[in-house]
Amino acid sequence: MVLSRFSVLERALTLGGLAPLALIGAAPQQQDGRITELLPPGYVHGSAPPQSQVVIPAPTPLVTDINSLVGGFGGKVGVAVKSIDAGWMVAKNGDVPMPQQSVSKLWVTLTALDQIDQGRISLDDPLTITQSDLTLFHQPIASLLKNGVYQTTVRELIRRAMTMSDNTANDRLLRHVGGPTAVNAFITRHSLGAIKFGPGERLLQSRTAGLAWKQDYAMGRAFQAARAKLPPNVRQAAFNSYVANPIDGAAAASIANALTKLRRGELLSPASTSYLIGVMESSRTGHARLRASVPPGWRLAHKTGTGQDLMGRTAGFNDVGILTAPDGRAYAVAVMIGETSRPTQDRQKLMQNVVARVVAYHDSEAPQRLMAE
């Protein structure tokens, strides 16, 4: 795999007339005794100034495809695709913060696994869910409470949050790792860019609706009933404010870069990296989104997110993930539909088309990769 990645870089350097210089600069790093004999006396490995990193341009056909898909969709949409191996990125509106909704569960789990790597918490830490922990909307764990209590673990909460998008599981995990402050600190420490973590599920959803949160809203459909009683202008003002400046906003390019760092092992230990990607590959949500265009032999580790609806508009319809080809090459993909009135099938089709274009590009490059190898 290292050889194939080098071949891509070598071709790019050759086109720029830099291949000989790059090869000379790389030679002292080899462990070949013949090269060592040619080094000057007193040479210290790594003493030379660092070479400037060569940026491989994004493939023009894929740039054209992504621009066309997003430009023809309408609404507020950001898409980013990054080659985890070559490093290039294709993005359209990639720097515009979009409502994350449940995509933000990824940052909570990353924070938890980071603390596990530090020895501060464990996957097997016992935790208790009570009625005071319940949130709203999708929370299947609520049905497991017996006499108002359910005993669980960090491991189960991660699984439920990441594969079922269980809001209560995520919020309980969030509290265990130190709340939004801890998550935002993780994002900042790892320089993940334009990614904000909001106040948690209850405050996020109540503010988007124009309500002040009450724990009674966690029971049954109490939240929906209270929301329906609000004057239309109150709901619309809150909805528009959230879409314009989402408190959980994240840019598609920043998410793609973060997923790239995850896949490269730059965020977590090898064990935690493998564990999280495995959990994300077993996700049960969004079968008609990115996953619908994943061919046999390919793998997708992903997280979806979906916001509230108001008068035919949706604030956040997202899917982000790591798409891995049979040959091991991988791409970080983020499709963030911040606001749209397009039908659900159209939104899903946009996501499917993005994956289809990435796969088509990858397959079109296969003959060149084989020749280079």
Which positions does each model-derived feature cover?
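Short, motif-level signal for alpha-helix interfacial/capping segments enriched in acidic residues
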Residues: K82-I84, K229, R284
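Hydrophobic membrane-targeting alpha-helices
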Residues: L21-P28, Q115
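Active-site-proximal helix/loop microenvironment
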Residues: A194-A271
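A short small-residue
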Residues: W88, K146, A237-F239, V335-I337
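Structured C-terminal helix/loop/strand segments within mature extracytoplasmic catalytic/sensor domains
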Residues: V2-S7, R11, A27-L69, P180, ...
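Bacterial N-terminal signal peptides
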Residues: T14-A22
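Active-site-adjacent loops and short helices of periplasmic peptidoglycan-processing enzymes
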Residues: Q31-A212
